[in-house]
Structure formats: structure tokens, C-alpha cells
Amino acid sequence: MPEQYRYTLPVKAGEQRLLGELTGAACATLVAEIAERHAGPVVLIAPDMQNALRLHDEISQFTDQMVMNLADWETLPYDSFSPHQDIISSRLSTLYQLPTMQRGVLIVPVNTLMQRVCPHSFLHGHALVMKKGQRLSRDALRTQLDSAGYRHVDQVMEHGEYATRGALLDLFPMGSELPYRLDFFDDEIDSLRVFDVDSQRTLEEVEAINLLPAHEFPTDKAAIELFRSQWRDTFEVKRDPEHIYQQVSKGTLPAGIEYWQPLFFSEPLPPLFSYFPANTLLVNTGDLETSAERFQADTLARFENRGVDPMRPLLPPQSLWLRVDELFSELKNWPRVQLKTEHLPTKAANANLGFQKLPDLAVQAQQKAPLDALRKFLETFDGPVVFSVESEGRREALGELLARIKIAPQRIMRLDEASDRGRYLMIGAAEHGFVDTVRNLALICESDLLGERVARRRQDSRRTINPDTLIRNLAELHIGQPVVHLEHGVGRYAGMTTLEAGGITGEYLMLTYANDAKLYVPVSSLHLISRYAGGAEENAPLHKLGGDAWSRARQKAAEKVRDVAAELLDIYAQRAAKEGFAFKHDREQYQLFCDSFPFETTPDQAQAINAVLSDMCQPLAMDRLVCGDVGFGKTEVAMRAAFLAVDNHKQVAVLVPTTLLAQQHYDNFRDRFANWPVRIEMISRFRSAKEQTQILAEVAEGKIDILIGTHKLLQSDVKFKDLGLLIVDEEHRFGVRHKERIKAMRANVDILTLTATPIPRTLNMAMSGMRDLSIIATPPARRLAVKTFVREYDSMVVREAILREILRGGQVYYLYNDVENIQKAAERLAELVPEARIAIGHGQMRERELERVMNDFHHQRFNVLVCTTIIETGIDIPTANTIIIERADHFGLAQLHQLRGRVGRSHHQAYAWLLTPHPKAMTTDAQKRLEAIASLEDLGAGFALATHDLEIRGAGELLGEEQSGSMETIGFSLYMELLENAVDALKAGREPSLEDLTSQQTEVELRMPSLLPDDFIPDVNTRLSFYKRIASAKTENELEEIKVELIDRFGLLPDPARTLLDIARLRQQAQKLGIRKLEGNEKGGVIEFAEKNHVNPAWLIGLLQKQPQHYRLDGPTRLKFIQDLSERKTRIEWVRQFMRELEENAIA
């Protein structure tokens, strides 16, 4: 820190300082410096949310003090939805800490500062601290949680939820990063542990936790009474059960209840200023007054527009927000510093700090000496120079760049470590640098050298989806759903039931078959059951118990599977035998190309890129599928592969399904390769015949490096001089003939296929190695999940949704999939929302006209596009963040997911409205589809969809058409299992036999209760999921894992659960030995061997001779044992010991 500062800080209330000449990251360095100087908290007021987020990242780079944001609700004033639970949690946590904040920076956007907040007394009065060893009755705690607004659920997933199971209580407190598990011993807290939401496993112990209320207002009985009486004083009461008053009276909180927050308190809501400690210093950047006035005008306009709904009468704006004049009179009560970029006139309260813009230092990739500008600046600047990069990965890239002009910067953590004429490097989020003329120091950020960098991904602490847990999981079975039993065929699930057989209670899965026949499957045999997935549920077959239709279908499928496996191996062998081209990787050129990518790559994206590059550098032909949700950056993977190909003087073909997409790829590729001597052309209906002929001639001569086009590229008159890479986008949109053409190219050209249609992981396992798969499941920077609503059509809902979007400067897709009446629909919208500028786009328009419409929409010349599903693939418009789909019940799930992916391509909250007719006018299937899509708000949910959407589009297509037939008869999961077994057998050089494929599963029956009691795991779906996992476990380790997880999540194992795991272990042993059946009872039991087994006959004969009173043969494959096993514990022990002896004497 320099000894003398260039400015003094205001101390008294109302005293102001204006500091000028702050450019680039100088604002952030200055706020950091103020935070270190000022003996109290600093509140930084930003003009809007975007600036607040950027400043948070930048300031954190320059100080070790705490830097916090007060989250904004991110809803419109008087909105009909509530903020996300995570936002409320973060706000409560910040508000709770604020009054006692000693030092540090709190950043608040103006409109959040204007919003009134809950009284401080409420937060402190309702916070509860729980410690290990504390005496606390569980019932009292549950009552307390209920009255604090926590929701009781079966499994804790979100903030504000709790679950109880026996002596355990799971709880996700507001303001906490992770949920906690409390273990009670009587009425004492025995242990407090943090656990992971996804796996539900505990992580570590803690001593105490702090419990904040679940909302920013009380929800206990007294508060609801107060709400009711204040409502009656303010508005009239409607009898309608949908009315806000009636809903709150019943104890349910309707969406958007936050805008009636004042009615829950007896005194008016205070401003945020009431939370600031007395020694707070305010700092503001940007034009406060304009931002505040704009916000006030918006609020007023919405109050007037929305105040007409008798079901939702509104409170006046002043009870929820400060007026602009109130805001400024509050500001006068505090010392305040204003930061300005311009030079200020000389006055006592003003100081100019002498920060100046850097000269233009951009790297000129196409020049001979790309780093000339930077080199000259460094030679002439005689103070320290600090380079700032965003991450370790970028640090290496910058290091390589600087090495070319012989500069090796030294790593520092703080700006004031820079001295003399040193060259330094620090990691942080600063966007633009500056020259500090007073300290004679220059800060150069990455974007000063490489052009605009766009926000890197703020690590979202929200959960990521683990696709494996979604697939083949029985946890979501509903009664009436089709399931496959390996031995009896496709039936319908009819629920779980407990039956008593021979005095032993067991839990069974009940299935119904044709003619109402029932089959009870013991839970130990759940490995024989899988969900039926292979087509629409209503088309699933229903087999007859004991009939031979199933065994015939299974036999046929197994034969088919064998052929498929052979075909796959054949393609693979051909690829392995044919030498592809091994590309050379010129790292320096490639790095320069990567540096001009304005986003930080996500971890999955980086993995996909590395996989593709290493495939291309192998002599084998590449065949890789990159699968990622819409807009997760698959195109960049393709561009880098194309760059490597062109750098090796090879040509690249990019094949896309539609002309619009071709145009978009063409524009993107042209932009991305703008600084490189690469020639890119496009072949599509937009080109005249003459242009096309010209292009084809140049392709054949090798003058064109990258050719983009629709299926025209596959015509026989397209000849490449030296094609090295074929990139196929959305392969499933091409017809069979086109696919055959692509298949023919496979063996000797590197092929990269991009798709957003999710392909289940299981498919990849079965194809192990046929086609390599990369999955991109992390969303790029600041993409929020798309909020999805399923609503009956209502013109007010439509008007609201369109206004919400256009008021924040965005655009709307209005999907109307009926070309005949699309004109009428557009006219109806124009009447409903006169503020909107509307255009129409559909597939039957003349191609050029459609192109013009899309282009205008892209350039924001109008803000509502009424269109058909033409927008389904790939058109990328970041400012379009609302999609409204009329008659959403007419779409398939995968299609709805694709369409929803058109929005939410920036860091604004995106909305998808699925409008439907009256529920009675929809099929149940359509209702289920809409429920499924609404439940999968998370980004990257494409994979989950593959399981929900049992249409599994990818499956039939990967292998050619006739496949999907056999898949429909036996179901997807079983089909995949058969295919996996067949591929393994063929790889090992064995001919796969049906026995091999539908291998006989061992039965173990010891006549003792073996189940997960429902008082141990009350939720039937969770129980079912565990049964399936136990039955399907292949190794002892897997069972051990499951056991640890059960104890961890539900407490000590009851005896029947222990027995269930023991029997599963015995089944694994018996299966390995080739034992078909193992029965035990009080007097002994029977072991039945399969024809092919690993039991040593000599050892067995010896046993029969030595102990004839205990063992005897009963037919050629049955061994009887006579033993007193009336004690259940000894029964398991004895059988386990006998199995061990069999294992020790097994033969190969």
C-alpha cells in the first residue's frame, strides 16, 4: 500500500466525495482499497444486476476481505411467481449476517436496494441454533420447522425441506450450502452430519447448525391470523378457493405471495438501510438516479396493469419499495463516495485519480508479428506491468503467448506486490486493464489482448445430474406401467405387497398379465425385472403367463442381437484395419485459434475436445459422437476439429439437416475463422445453379477448405480433392438413404457426429467401442435453467409472458404448429399485445423469404416470431428468452425438450410456457409428457429425458431400421443387456448362445424374512429402487456400498434387511459356482446344480462317502443336506460356510 492516498474518505453522514478518472478494473481496485482502509463495512451500489455480478468477481481479485452480493428476487414487480428457493436462501443468509458485519464489501443493485425487507427483529427472533448434545424433543422440533415454513418431504433435495425417518431427521436450512442429518438418541441430538443431496450419503460431522426461517416472512398461526385481518382491512374477501386470501387461510402459500409480504407483519417493512451497521460507508458507480427512476416507472406501470385482477388485488408500490425521493433522502444519512469514469472539475470534494485507458494491444493473428503492439508497449513503459487472467488454464495460454516475445511473468497474489520494472501475472476476473499514472503501473487483462472474453461459468453450487442414476432405475414406476420379467415377458406393475408364505413374511412386486393373471415376484428376484422402454407405453405388449409367445420373442431377439453384434464388430474391424489419416497437431497455431474463443470451455467440453483431437491424431479413422444438450457448445468442438483438419491441408465437410442451420453454421464458421486463411463455402438452396457449379468445381480442385451444406453434400456429383473430416449435425434428422451414404464413408474418413437428442449411457455401454461417445452435460457460463410452466390457454397469461420478455429487451418465440391458421394466430396476438412487433415464419414459405424473416429476428428488427417447429434445430438467438408453445399436448417429449432449448442461451432467466386445452381434451399420455418436461428444469436434463421419453429415438437409428422391431417386443433394457453379452462373447471368440444371453439366474430361498421393512424405508419408490440395486449387484463390494448407504441414510439395519443382503451375497457365490437353486429350511435343504457348473465331482463324492448321514444325491443334479438349522442365524452361517468349501474346491 502506498503511504499517502490520493483521496480522503468521507466520515460524517451526508458527506460526499467524487472520485474521477476510473477506467476498466480501476473501479474494482479502488473499492478493494477502500475496503482495506475503512474501519467498517462498505456497501457498493451498482446500476444493475449484471454490473453487480461483474464487480463481485473483479473486487474479489484485489482484496482478501469478504465480498458478498445481496441476491435480487429476479422476478418482475407484482409477479405471479415466487423467487427460487436458492435465491431466498442466499438473501436470508446475507441479511442475517449484515448487522454484525465488521469489514468487507456488500454489493447491491439499485432496484434491490429500493426493495423493502423483512424487519431485523423477525430474522433474529426466528433463527435457531442447534448443537450436538443439546436436549430437544423431536416433535417440538418438527412443530417448530412447520411453523418456520419448512416443507415436510420424503427425501430432502432443496433448501427449506426436512424429512424424518425413525431417529434421523434430514434438514436443508436456508442459508446453508449443504443439508444436515441429525441423529437423535431419545430427546438428545446425538450427532450432526453434513450430507450430499445427490447420493444422500453423509460427508462429515459438525458441532452446531444455524437454522433460519424458510421465507422472508413468518408463516406460523399468529402470522396467518395477522395476514387475514390485515387483508380484510385492505381488500374485500372473495369466496373463490383460488383466491389468495383463501389459500393463505388454508396454510398454502400461492406463487408470488412475496408481493403481499407486508400483511404478515404488524409494522411497515423497513428499508435495507436499517440493516447497515453504524460505521457503514456507501460507494456507488454508474448513474443511480436514472436507474432508480426507470425502476420506479416500471413498478408503477405494472401496478396499474395488474391491479385489475379481482383474484389478486395489489398493495401500493410504496409499501414494497422506496420511492426515488425516499431513496435519496436515505442516502443522505451516510457518508458516500461516487465513482466516475470521466475527469472531474477541481473542487474540494472531488479528486481525479489518474487512471487511463491502455493503448490498443490486441493480438493481430493474421499479421506477421501478431504481438507487435504489446512488445512496443512493454519496451516503452518503465513501471511494473501486471497481466491478469481468469483461470489456471488461461494462465498457461497467456504464458505461451508471452514466451514468444521472451517474457516470463512472475506470479503474484496482490497488486501491491508489483514493483520496479517487473512483469507479473495474477489470476482473477478483471475484464479491462488500465494505466495508473500515479503509481506508474499497468494492468493488462486477457480481453485487452484477445478481444472480448465473455463471462466464465460462475460455479453454480446447484446440483449436477448424474445420468446413470436416472437410467434403468425403478424408482419412478407408477401403477399400470409396463415392466419386463426376464422369464415371463411384459406385464403391468400393480404395486408392492407383503405376503406370508409358510409363516415367513416377505415383500413382493405384483405384476398382472393377460387374462388378469397375477405374478408375485419376491424382492430378491428384482434383477429379473426392468422397466419396459422401447416405444409408447400404450403399444407395449401384454404377454400371457405360461404362453410361449414370450420365449419365441426372446429367442428371436437373441438371434437378431447376435447378428447386430457381429455387424458392429465387423464395422469396427474394418475401421481398425483401414489406415485412416493421423493428423499432426501444431500446438502453437492451434493455441492461437483457441484463444480467440470468447468463452471459457466447460469441463465436459474440454474433455470432448481432447477426445476428438486425440482420435484424429490416431492412424485409425475416428467415429465419435458428441452428445450434449441444446446450446451446450458442441459447435466449438466441431470448429476445433475442423481447424486441425485444415491445418493438415485436408478438406472438411459439414452436413446439416436444414438450410437455415446451414446458413447459421456458415456464419459461425466464417466468424470463427475470420483471422485465418481458410476458405469456407456453403451449398444450399440459396445458391443459384451457377454459383453451385462454381463451388463444386473449386471443391474438386481443393481450393475450398470447409464446405457446409444439407444432404446435397451427399450427392454423387460432389467430389472432394482430399476429404479428411466429415462433421454431421443432428444425424437423426436424415433419412435412411442418406445414413447409408454416411455409413459408406465411415470406414476411411474421420467422422464427428453432433447431436442434442440424448442417447442413454446404456446404449454407449453396449456399443462399447463401436462409436466413441462424449457427453457434454455442464451448461455454459451463467445459463440459468429454463423455468417451465404448463398452463391451460389463457390470453392474460400470454400477454404477461410476452410483456415480461419485451420489457427486459428480449424476444419471444410463439409456436403455433398449424400453417393453415398461423396468420389468424398472429393477428390475434397483435390485438392482445399491441406493444409487440410481430412476424411469421414457417416451413411452407419460400426459402428466401423465410431466410429474411429469420435474419430480421436475429437482428432484433421485431420481437415476437410466430412460427412452426422450423425453429426446432439449432437456430441460436441469445436475446430470445421466452418460448410459448400453443397446444403443447401435440408434441413428443424429445421435441418439446429441443424446442425449450431454443431459449435460455444467455444469463437471463428463460421461460417456457406450454399451453394446453382443458385437461379433459388431452390424452393421459400427453399429460404425462408435459409433467415430465416440467419436472426437468435442470439444464443437461437431456439425459434424464431419454429415460422419461421412452420413445428412445436414438436407439433404432444407431443400428439401422429393422432393429427397433425386436426392441419393442422385449423392451429396451433387456435388449441392451442381450447386446452387451453378445458383443462380449464375440470379442472373446465364443459363439453367443441364448443360454448365455438369457443366463439362468440363481434362486436362493432360506425361509426367513428378508425385506426392507416399511418403517425402515417408508417411501415405496425408494424401497423399490434399493431392492433393484441389491438384486442387480454383481460383486460383494457393491453390496457393501449399498449396506453402508442404507445405514447412513436410514439408521441401523433391522434383521430382515440384514438377511436380505446376506441372501444377495449367497446368490452371487452360487451364481459363480453354477448353482441354479439353493433352498434351506429348519431341517436342511437342497442345492440344484446347472448342467455347466464349477463344482469338483471328486470332492463331492468324497463328501457323500464321508458323511452319508448329512449329504445325499437326489437325482443327477440335486444334492440334499440334512442338518439342524432351526436357529435362523446358524442357518445363514452354515450355508455360507458350505458355499465357501464349494468355492475352495471349485474347478475352472
Curated annotation (Swiss-Prot):
It comes from the Bacteria. The keyword Nucleotide-binding applies. One of its GO terms (cellular component) is DNA repair complex. ATP binds at residues 628-635. Keywords: ATP-binding, Cytoplasm, DNA damage, DNA repair, DNA-binding, Helicase, Hydrolase, Nucleotide-binding. Residues 615-776 form the Helicase ATP-binding domain. Gene3D superfamilies: 2.40.10.170, 3.40.50.11140, 3.40.50.11180, P-loop containing nucleotide triphosphate hydrolases, Penicillin-binding protein 1b domain, Transcription-repair-coupling factor, D7 domain. It is found in: Cytoplasm. Residues 798-951 form the Helicase C-terminal domain. Its EC number is 3.6.4.-. A motif (DEEH box) lies at residues 729-732. The keyword Cytoplasm applies. Signal peptide: none annotated. Disulfide bonds: none annotated. GO terms for biological process: DNA damage response; DNA repair; nucleotide-excision repair, preincision complex assembly; regulation of DNA-templated transcription; transcription-coupled nucleotide-excision repair; transcription-coupled nucleotide-excision repair, DNA damage recognition. It is an enzyme of class 3 (hydrolase). Consists of a compact arrangement of structured domains linked by long, flexible linkers. The N-terminal region interacts with UvrA, the central region interacts with RNAP, and the C-terminal DNA translocase region possesses ATPase activity. Activity is regulated by a conformational switch from a dormant closed state to an active open state upon substrate binding. Couples transcription and DNA repair by recognizing RNA polymerase (RNAP) stalled at DNA lesions. Mediates ATP-dependent release of RNAP and its truncated transcript from the DNA, and recruitment of nucleotide excision repair machinery to the damaged site. Can also dissociate RNAP that is blocked by low concentration of nucleoside triphosphates or by physical obstruction, such as bound proteins. In addition, can rescue arrested complexes by promoting forward translocation. Has ATPase activity, which is required for removal of stalled RNAP, but seems to lack helicase activity. This is Transcription-repair-coupling factor. It comes from Escherichia coli (strain K12). The gene is mfd.
